[in-house]
Amino acid sequence: MLSLSLKKLCKMIYLRPFELLEVNRLISWVNSPELLVQFSGPGFNFPLTKVAWDKHLSDTSIHPYFVVDLNTDETIGYSEIVKVDENEVKLCRLLIGDPDLRGLGLGKLLVRELIYESLAIASPKRILLNVYNHNTAAIKCYQSEGFVINESVSKTSLVDGMEWKSFQMDLML
């Protein structure tokens, strides 16, 4: 019999189009100002609201998804693909909602699913994403899926009086 932790590692996921009527689930996961910035960048105010998220999703280049556990059909995360143009897409706002499910390899599965879905949305030659330099777990996850740090594209945000540096990571196809 598999141990509980090994069973968690064996979980498979799929992407389901996000529906605004379920936004409260997303809002409940983003439960601190720091997590909001890490998840969405500096463009939102805490607490996240349905109105702000609805406005955000009015951009038709954004393809939002819930991340769903294939075994239980439980919604466990959120992510977006932004079509920059036909040759480039950006992965944004990757989040496994339940902290107990983080660090179990689901992020790698999510990145793979997003790469496959990106190919259905466009014909990208490059997939990019942004990550804060202190988010080492995410950086390792993205590197394991072939993304390379591009420090020439970086930004700094002020979060609670501290500077957070982010940089771009690229996957060339």
Spans of features found by a protein language model:
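Acetyl-CoA-dependent GNAT
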Residues: 9, 13, 17-23, 28-100, ...
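Solvent-exposed beta-strand sheet faces enriched in polar/charged residues
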Residues: 82, 128-130, 150
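Glycine-rich acyl-CoA binding loop
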Residues: 105-111
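Conserved GNAT acetyl-CoA-binding A-motif
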Residues: 120-130
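Conserved active-site alpha-helix within GNAT-family acetyltransferase domains
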Residues: 108, 133-151
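Terminal substrate-recognition subdomain of acyl/acetyltransferases
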Residues: 2-5, 162-173
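Conserved beta-strand-loop-alpha-helix junction that forms the acyl-donor binding cleft
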Residues: 128-139, 156-161
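Active-site acidic-Proline motif in GNAT/NAT acetyltransferases
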Residues: 97-100, 104, 133-134
